[in-house]
């Protein structure tokens, strides 16, 4: 598990994950709506990706309704609070083990 609030560090974490992990669970917060760099790094990652939002982005301000990273992720979980992390971990486990 890695965490950063710095866009460049998040990109570095995603890029290093290409050689270490089969999946990424990402809560990019406000960067979901603004960061082309994070989107591009996720797009290069070949594993499974779950985008996570603690709040329901569709119940918030209009500009939050569009996540630019959604187009390159495997699935999205939003609006379930911190329980979304448990669902994301369980879902990732299922996805990574479905062909074994």
Residue ranges and their predicted role:
Residues 64-82:
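Short beta-strand elements at the ligand-binding edges of bilobed clamshell
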Residues 78-100:
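A charged, well-structured terminal subsegment
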Residues 36-37, 60-63:
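Short, conserved acidic/polar surface loops in the N-terminal third of protein domains
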Residues 7, 31-32, 55-57, 82:
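Alpha-helix N-cap/helix-start and coil->helix boundary motif
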Residues 23-24, 48-50, 67, 74-75:
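Structural motif
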Residues 2, 50-52, 77:
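Hydrophobic/aromatic beta-strand patches that form the interior of the parallel beta-sheet core
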Residues 44-60:
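Short, acidic/small-residue loops that bind anionic groups at enzyme active sites
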Residues 3-46:
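N-terminal small/polar loop signature for handling phosphorylated ligands or for N-terminal nucleophile
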């Amino acid at each position: 598990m890695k965490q950063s609030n710095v866009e460049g560090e998040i990109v570095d974490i995603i890029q290093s994950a290409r050689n270490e992990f089969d999946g990424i669970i990402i809560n990019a917060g406000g960067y979901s709506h603004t960061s082309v760099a994070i989107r591009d790094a996720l797009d290069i990652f070949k594993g499974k990706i779950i985008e996570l939002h603690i709040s329901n982005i569709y119940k918030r301000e209009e500009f939050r309704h569009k996540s630019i990273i959604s187009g390159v992720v495997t699935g999205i979980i939003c609006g379930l609070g911190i329980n979304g992390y448990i669902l994301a971990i369980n879902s990732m486990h299922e996805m990574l083990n479905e062909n074994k």
